[in-house]
């Protein structure tokens, strides 16, 4: 496999501003890890959220909620595990793995509630809760992934505790706009007794993430 890493202020030079913004307050510089493998077959890109520790930022988590936040890189770990399996079994794929790796920390230059940020794609985002940082780093990584026009993009993330509220601890919620992928995933989940639950793209909800000040509202949690 070939691996390249974009670190610190180089993220700004490479137009990955959201990854830089989320991680700039930490002593360890934010970075984007880019792994590629394989020269034939369909193009598969995996994107994993790599928030290596999450304090919540200026919207600081309570102590009881912060204790396990070293696990907020679960998406990155999962895609690396899947990539290892793909490479070890020699699957006929052109594989790419993108991991935005950051710590969401607190310092004088941390991003703030009510900041307006511009993403790689050019969309602006109003920050109303700095503890919703995962979707920011994924946004830039997914935009980069899409530029390569892969046959399929799969992202994995410990994105929100609201998933547990919605479907409980036993079901893994997911979104997909690919009916064939949905059928394959649901079949595999049933075969291996590892249940998943498809979440809806419900058009009437779209105005809830369009605040008017920016193109998008980061979160409904204020």
Model regions and ranges:
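A generic structural signal for tightly packed, nonpolar segments enriched in small/aliphatic residues
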Residues: 2-221
């Amino acid at each position: 496999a070939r691996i390249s890493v974009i670190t610190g202020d180089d993220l700004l030079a490479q137009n990955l501003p959201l990854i830089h913004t989320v991680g700039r307050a930490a002593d360890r510089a934010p970075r984007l890890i880019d792994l590629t493998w394989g020269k034939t077959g369909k193009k598969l890109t995996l994107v994993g959220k790599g928030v290596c520790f999450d304090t919540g930022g200026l919207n600081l988590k309570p102590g009881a909620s912060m204790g396990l936040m070293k696990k907020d890189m679960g998406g990155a770990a999962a895609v690396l595990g899947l990539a290892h399996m793909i490479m070890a079994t020699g699957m006929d794929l052109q594989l790419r793995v993108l991991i935005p790796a950051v710590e969401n920390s607190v310092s004088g230059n941390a991003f703030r509630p009510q900041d307006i940020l511009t993403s790689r794609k050019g969309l602006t985002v109003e920050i109303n809760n700095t503890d919703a940082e995962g979707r920011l780093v994924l946004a830039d990584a997914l935009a980069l992934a899409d530029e390569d026009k892969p046959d399929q993009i799969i992202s994995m993330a410990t994105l929100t505790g609201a998933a547990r509220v919605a479907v409980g601890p036993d079901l893994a919620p997911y979104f997909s706009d690919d009916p064939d992928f949905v059928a394959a995933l649901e079949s595999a989940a049933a075969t291996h007794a590892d249940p998943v639950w498809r979440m809806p793209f419900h058009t009437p909800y779209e105005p809830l993430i369009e605040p008017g000040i920016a193109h998008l509202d980061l979160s409904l949690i204020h």
